[in-house]
């Protein structure tokens, strides 16, 4: 295979600029930049925020290769009856995740089925990040006067930089693997909920079948 070598590029049109190429190759992920006078060089993309890494999937045991290792999701095969004690929501786990270098926010998202098995049932939930309950992730639901079926989406942005806060979920830095998950409970045995369930399904009526939650992350930042 032939090789052509040059240190300058120029267009033949009148008034065209002459560009001087870098003398060495750049690193993976770098872009070519100009200094405004025709000298080109490799450097990082310091522009606007962009998605650096993302996955979202049913909790069926799938594995995803990330910039810092493989993340394997849980495999949910049954529903969860809530109690008055907070329980981990099966399938909501993302374990050992480290975002790419340059990440300033990680968005954690879980979508799951719920069915109230009592009238006006009451539910509570929160996100747990690296073993800490995040105060501002708390949420509550109350069912209708009859049974309720719903597909609930929980979404929370974890900001990186500044001071760590278990109130807002902010992390000063994120350079090692952390676990993210949801926990749920119910008010009492007269206000019961079931999670990871498909209740009624249109014309097919009541199903009571297991519905795997969908879980994922989006890492946002600059290269």
Label for each model-derived stretch:
Residues 45-75:
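N-terminal leader/pro-regions and domain N-caps
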Residues 9, 42, 56-57, 127-128, ...:
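Short beta-strand element of the conserved SAM-dependent methyltransferase core
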Residues 22-25, 45-47, 61, 139-145:
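A short, sequence-level motif marking secondary-structure junctions
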């Amino acid at each position: 295979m032939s090789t052509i070598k040059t240190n300058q590029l120029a267009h033949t049109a009148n008034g065209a600029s002459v560009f001087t190429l870098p003398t060495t190759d750049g690193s993976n992920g770098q872009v070519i930049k100009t200094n405004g006078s025709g000298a080109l060089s490799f450097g990082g993309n310091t522009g606007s925020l962009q998605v650096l890494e993302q996955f979202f999937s049913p909790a069926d045991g799938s594995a995803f290769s990330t910039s810092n290792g493989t993340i394997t999701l849980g495999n949910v095969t049954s529903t969860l009856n809530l109690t008055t004690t907070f329980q981990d929501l099966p399938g909501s786990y993302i374990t050992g995740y480290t975002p790419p270098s340059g990440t300033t926010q990680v968005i954690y998202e879980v979508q799951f089925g719920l069915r109230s098995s009592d009238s006006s049932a009451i539910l509570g939930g929160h996100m747990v990040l690296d073993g800490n309950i995040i105060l501002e992730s708390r949420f509550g639901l109350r069912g209708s006067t009859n049974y309720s079926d719903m597909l609930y989406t929980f979404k929370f942005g974890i900001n990186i930089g500044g001071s760590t806060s278990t109130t807002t979920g902010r992390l000063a830095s994120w350079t090692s693997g952390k676990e993210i998950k949801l926990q749920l409970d119910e008010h009492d045995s007269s206000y019961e909920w079931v999670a990871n369930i498909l209740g009624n399904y249109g014309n097919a009526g009541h199903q009571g079948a297991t519905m795997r939650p969908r879980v994922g992350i989006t890492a946002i930042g600059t290269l």
